[in-house]
Amino acid sequence: MIKNFDPYRDRQARLIRNSLSTAFVQSLKDRNPAAFAATAELLLRQDISADKKAYILDRLARYRECITTIEQQGVQTILEQSFVLWDAQLFFEVHEILEGLWLTAQGREKAALQGLIRAAGVYILLAAGNRQGAEKMAAKSVQALEENGAALAYFPSSRQLLTSLRNLVPSPPKLRG
């Protein structure tokens, strides 16, 4: 997390995070970085603090890296894309991209997706210094993934993720290798 960038207490930071994330999800759908690049350019033109500029530039770099990985490795599904984002530690964006799948999923798949969304939330909370909230969310995530993870068409390194969540390992595991 960029020092002094707090989307929980700073409305402008929240707007920046949400705008960039929405544009990035659109770029993933379009398979074109234009949406997030244009959004970042507009945000960088505003009168914003150095920490907000650093956040935007950091996100731009990670978004470009993810788009490149997705293109070069032929990653097709949203679920597979979410693990590329996970490995880039884009946990808010993992939540955003999986939420669309979760809304249309049913049964065990829906529960498993909720478990993954909560797993991303664990690392968002840890980065914000909310260990107590992360512990509660990790327990819910572990239960959902243990009971329903097999319903996902693609779930690399599930054991590693479950171990990290159970032990609340502060450094998130790489899930794609």
What are these regions (language model features)?
Residues 1-93, 100-104, 147-177:
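N-terminal alpha-helical interaction modules that lie
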Residues 74-75, 107, 111-114:
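Residues that mark the junctions of alpha-helical repeat units in TPR/alpha-solenoid scaffolds
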Residues 130-149:
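TPR/TPR-like (Sel1-like) alpha-helical repeat modules
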Residues 123-126, 136:
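Extended alpha-helical scaffolding segments
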Residues 98-99, 118-119:
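Hydrophobic, membrane-inserted alpha-helices
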